[in-house]
Amino acid sequence: MSGLRPALSTFLFLLLITGGVYPLLTTALGQWWFPWQANGSLIREGDTVRGSALIGQNFTGNGYFHGRPSATAEMPYNPQASGGSNLAVSNPELDKQIAARVAALRAANPNASTNVPVELVTASASGLDNNITPQAAAWQIPRVAKARNLSVEQLTQLIAKYSQQPLVKYIGQPVVNIVELNLALDKLDE
């Protein structure tokens, strides 16, 4: 019975620290130092949330740049169902999915002169990726330009404006945030 009191007091002390003080401290510091990131990197237009800079959206019209396929096929870009397709490279089902995606992209982008960029036909590990390379965005320019009556030069400049360079040049590659790029396209129409 003599060991019960120190064990109970240690338990209560650690419960207070790990269940109360630590979460409150990290939340307060996150809100203070990184308020935009701590709140989900939400993209707002006035009082309306248009999306998150961290999660892709299902842009399907010809007037929008398309991102990577979502692995959450039933409800595209659903963060609650996040996860990869888990299909191995040797799996025939993956080959069928990629072939179907290539055919759909070729049909939607008949003026594209090069091969379909790989990230437009393969899902990311999370299935929610919001970034593609500037080259994959540029591949879609003819379709978007035709649908929106914009010039190739305008869209090339827009892609360059929304391209983000890697933090360290030799690690990673430039990317374009599809959500931000498509919202900028919508603003051009206003």
UniProtKB/Swiss-Prot annotation:
Coiled coil start-end: none
Its localization reads:
Cell inner membrane
Q: Which residues cross the membrane?
A: 10-30
What membrane topology is annotated for this entry? Single-pass membrane protein
Q: Which Pfam families match?
A: KdpC (PF02669)
Q: Which controlled-vocabulary keywords does the entry list?
A: ATP-binding, Cell inner membrane, Cell membrane, Ion transport, Membrane, Nucleotide-binding, Potassium, Potassium transport, Transmembrane, Transmembrane helix, Transport
Q: What cellular component GO annotations does this protein have? A: plasma membrane
* GO molecular function annotations of the record: ATP binding; P-type potassium transmembrane transporter activity
Record-linked InterPro entries: KdpC
Function (record text): Part of the high-affinity ATP-driven potassium transport (or Kdp) system, which catalyzes the hydrolysis of ATP coupled with the electrogenic transport of potassium into the cytoplasm. This subunit acts as a catalytic chaperone that increases the ATP-binding affinity of the ATP-hydrolyzing subunit KdpB by the formation of a transient KdpB/KdpC/ATP ternary complex.
Q: Which family does the entry's similarity section mention? A: Belongs to the KdpC family.
- What does the subunit section of this Swiss-Prot or TrEMBL entry state? The system is composed of three essential subunits: KdpA, KdpB and KdpC.
HAMAP family assigned: KdpC (MF_00276)
Name listed for the protein in its UniProt record: Potassium-transporting ATPase KdpC subunit
The record lists the organism as Escherichia coli O81 (strain ED1a)
